[in-house]
Amino acid sequence: MKKGTILQNIAVFVDVQNIYYTTRDTYQRQFNYRLLWQELMAQSDIVLANAYAIQRSDDQQHKFQKALKHIGFNVKLKPYIQRSDGSAKGDWDVGITIDVMAAAANKNINTIVLLSGDGDFDLLLRHIKAEYGVKTIVYGVPNLTANSLINAADEYHEILQSLLL
């Protein structure tokens, strides 16, 4: 945690699958979590940082999750479920929602930062702003972030090439 003048006490929530696929589909590159962390720490105190990912028995995934932990994220994993019809399931929306609501209720946190383009979170952001008065910031890939989510946030930051590896 950063010492000195703190502009915001923030909680960061990363929908890892959403960020992975939207940056890959738009830029064919990966998101730079370390750079994001540095940018956020320059202007705030990170009280909580959760990254929500899918647990797969893959060496690259294990290295990635270890890197996230090294940066400072709590990595929350859910099993990867392959259905008989070939589709896959690994949705963290409810888990993210529960954790965001708990953080918003925490008097030590005044800003919620969400990395996702998923429009399902728009109601969540509207609710926590109305109920707890927290500031909400969304990071998402342009054209792949739901307008309803952008409109629900106090601030929207486009994930551009400068935030990629």
Tell what function each PLM region has:
Residues 1-92, 105, 134-136:
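Domain-level signal for Mg2+-assisted phosphodiester chemistry and nucleotide/NA-binding surfaces
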Residues 57-165:
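Nuclease catalytic cores that cleave nucleic-acid phosphodiester bonds
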